[in-house]
Amino acid sequence: MNFNKLQQISMNFKKKQKAFTLVEVLIAVSILTIGILSGFILITKVLYNTAVIQDRLTASFLEQEGIELTRQVRDSNFLQIMDGESVEWNNRLEDGSYTIESKAGSEQSVTLVSVDPGEAPNFFYDNDTKIYNYNTTGEPTTFNREIKITTINDDEIRVESIMKWKTRTIDFNLTIEDHLFNWLKF
């Protein structure tokens, strides 16, 4: 009788042990699944943030280029004045909104085109030259740049470079401001 009782206790223990092992497997699978999903979520967020950072960096370079090209127009005016030409220091820098683009090798290397405020066209990206431009020969991008010029007084203008772009489904914008002066007092 004792033997049967021991055998029954042993069988009950084995049954409990199998159920306990199944619970362990379920917990292990759950932990593994959570770990893998967390890894995928982390990778997805890293890839998204990388795209956002890359686009923000591109936008900041294009934005700075807009300010520098506007400064180049002012400096070209100074050079023309020094050569005896009759132009104002702020020639081609009238109040308004513009797109601005540099064309290497052309006689007038910087082109300002008037646009309605907030309506600047998107850039195209030329894979061969690695240059953003307004020509339709490259790939369309979501970047657009508006240069807003405001006269402060006879010797000062405010230049705002306003970048707008979209990364995936989120709209971004970035604005920098600079002041250009008639520092040569022409």
Regions found by a protein language model. Name each.
Residues 1-20:
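N-terminal leader/signal peptides at the extreme start of proteins
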Residues 61, 67-186:
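Low-complexity, Gly/Pro-rich coil/beta segments used as flexible assembly/activation regions
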Residues 4-6, 40, 49, 53, ...:
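Short amphipathic alpha-helical leader/targeting segments
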Residues 10-11, 57, 67:
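Intrinsic structural disorder/low-complexity segments
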Residues 4-5, 14, 33-34, 43-44, ...:
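Short secondary-structure boundary micro-motifs
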Residues 20-64, 77:
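Aliphatic-rich helix starts adjacent to a transmembrane/signal segment
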